[in-house]
Amino acid sequence: MMKNRVSNIHFVGIGGVGMSGIAEVLHNLGFKVSGSDQARNAATEHLSSLGIQVYPGHTAEHVNGADVVVASTAVKKENPEVVAALERQIPVIPRALMLAELMRFRDGIAIAGTHGKTTTTSLTASILGAAGLDPTFVIGGKLNAAGTNARLGKGEYIVAEADESDASFLHLTPIMSVVTNIDEDHMDTYGHSVEKLHQAFIDFIHRMPFYGKAFLCVDSEHVRAILPKVSKPYATYGLDDTADIYATDIENVGAQMKFTVHVQMKGHEQGSFEVVLNMPGRHNVLNALAAIGVALEVGASVEAIQKGLLGFEGVGRRFQKYGDIKLPNGGTALLVDDYGHHPVEMAATLAAARGAYPEKRLVLAFQPHRYTRTRDLFEDFTKVLNTVDALVLTEVYAAGEEPVAAADSRALARAIRVLGKLEPIYCENVADLPQMLMNVLQDGDVVLNMGAGSINRVPSALLELSKQI
């Protein structure tokens, strides 16, 4: 067991959302945890408050005494801490391998898929908590009810996201897995081959033991395509009545979704029950169905499922409502923040906003994430961005990439302008975006701040400007 051989664990890039969660759980398990990061953020401050040593910047001395070094995927091989660890024959492992080790301490439930992982993981943790199962969880966003993205529970289960972006989910050995959907994203990891992408998800499902169970969303075309090749036990879920778990009578009730769940899963009591999900969007109905499937498999009651969904307080940056902000013109606008950065998830979130606030003007502030994604999905981006009532685009968040010709926000603005419906506003510097939005917004608007990069700082800046009015 790792606990007999490893005492000191050092994280390089500990401030990342996936890294910080694992570090916190290991700390609470009794390991001595340290870490380093170039920049302080809310995650590093939280870890420091727990007594974890977090170093600013990277130097070789930081790995002194470490038994193992966990490196974020964003950390390069030339990092002085990685170099020093290798020179001293200290194992250097990716985040997913350490997550796999955590699954040796608990029964693992791994949530994979191109979109919806964070929400589905959070909903699963919420229901298992309501069922009294006290799960451990590691989530790619802050669970609002817990105030953190990770927690060590006393129960037998660990619920965690499984990251397909770098194929690291193939390190995991869960007893249950979920595939929310499969889309053509991070295709450089798979040699731009859909067949290799499909095979990776099949291999992920097959990481389960023979007694495991997968929950697969048949509303996803790519998931349907892999079903004939899946040899481990699985159940399907979706909006079609051929699925083992499906939903009908879906209704928007303000910012909630009310629907009927039908269960025709082998080995389970057949029947139906009503639930209210405390978040908007048909895509979140699918995410809830996945969580319901897992919950039923571990023995949670219908009452616990209903309680966990109705009492769900959301997760950071997933349709996160900040409330009304004051505007210079004397009115107010509702501020919502979201991590969406792929056209498919953006379309789902925008549809959720329309469903929740059908009478309001929808203003979108968007920062594209990566030039390559903008290039590869350029037409899809122009289509989805053209569905809002007003649009402010800030420049692409590079995420370490070099600029790509005709794949920036200016190019997107030009393409949308040609379609004739919108006159996009271009804001080159994201730091200028809050003030620009204050000038654009009208009384009664819903402003959706969206993107996976530095645009995450905009809500706090808008709230600060609102206080000054």
Curated annotation (Swiss-Prot):
Major location category of this protein: cytoplasm
GO biological process entries: cell division; cell wall organization; peptidoglycan biosynthetic process; regulation of cell shape
Short name of any one Pfam family annotated for the protein: Mur_ligase_C
MF terms in GO: ATP binding; UDP-N-acetylmuramate-L-alanine ligase activity
Binding site for ATP: G113, T114, H115, G116, K117, T118, T119
Biochemical pathway: Cell wall biogenesis; peptidoglycan biosynthesis
Function as written in the Swiss-Prot or TrEMBL entry: Cell wall formation.
Family: Belongs to the MurCDEF family.
Protein name as catalogued: UDP-N-acetylmuramate--L-alanine ligase
